[in-house]
């Protein structure tokens, strides 16, 4: 195995957005270049697009600063949202009942890989 590192990752943990909603946004950018993904996320109407964009930008910055990779050649090779801890709240209802409210959180992970210029 060669010593050339061609990928970098970034993770945002305990993000207060449900994993299903985060996955909906992540599916838009998986396999795209970092520049293309950030422009898609900038105009995506979903609330989860902001934390996903932050993680994509962080992964690109990690690749550039830690491994010296060119940010223009980076492609999102892996992106996923895992379920984080769920906060449970109770909402009082009629006749002494209480309904449970689940405030879900997620862990968003993005892996970027350097792709050769001629591979496009």
Swiss-Prot record:
Keyword Heme found: no
InterPro entries: Ribosomal_uL22, Ribosomal_uL22_bac/chlpt-type, Ribosomal_uL22_bac/org-type, Ribosomal_uL22_CS, Ribosomal_uL22_sf
Entry coiled-coil feature ranges: none
GO biological process: translation
Cellular component aspect of the GO annotation: cytosolic large ribosomal subunit
One Pfam match: Ribosomal_L22
Keywords: Ribonucleoprotein, Ribosomal protein, RNA-binding, rRNA-binding
Molecular function as annotated in GO: rRNA binding; structural constituent of ribosome
PROSITE patterns for this protein: RIBOSOMAL_L22 (PS00464)
UniProt cross-references to NCBIfam families, sorted A to Z: rplV_bact
Subunit structure as annotated in this protein's UniProt entry: Part of the 50S ribosomal subunit.
Function of the molecule: This protein binds specifically to 23S rRNA; its binding is stimulated by other ribosomal proteins, e.g. L4, L17, and L20. It is important during the early stages of 50S assembly. It makes multiple contacts with different domains of the 23S rRNA in the assembled 50S subunit and ribosome. The globular domain of the protein is located near the polypeptide exit tunnel on the outside of the subunit, while an extended beta-hairpin is found that lines the wall of the exit tunnel in the center of the 70S ribosome.
UniProt record similarity statement: Belongs to the universal ribosomal protein uL22 family.
Name of this chain's protein: Large ribosomal subunit protein uL22
Lineage: Bacteria, Bacillati, Actinomycetota, Actinomycetes, Mycobacteriales
């Amino acid at each position: 195995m060669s010593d050339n590192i061609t990928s970098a990752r970034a993770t945002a943990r305990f993000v207060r957005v449900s994993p299903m909603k985060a996955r909906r946004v992540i599916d838009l950018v998986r396999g795209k270049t970092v520049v293309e993904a950030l422009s898609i996320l900038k105009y995506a109407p979903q609330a989860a697009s902001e934390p996903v964009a932050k993680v994509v930008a962080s992964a690109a910055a990690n690749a550039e600063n830690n491994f010296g990779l060119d940010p223009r050649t980076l492609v999102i090779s892996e992106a996923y949202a895992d379920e984080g801890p769920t906060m449970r709240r109770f909402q009082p209802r009629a006749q002494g009942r209480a309904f449970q409210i689940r405030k879900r959180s997620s862990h968003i992970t993005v892996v970027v890989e350097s792709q050769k210029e001629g591979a496009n």
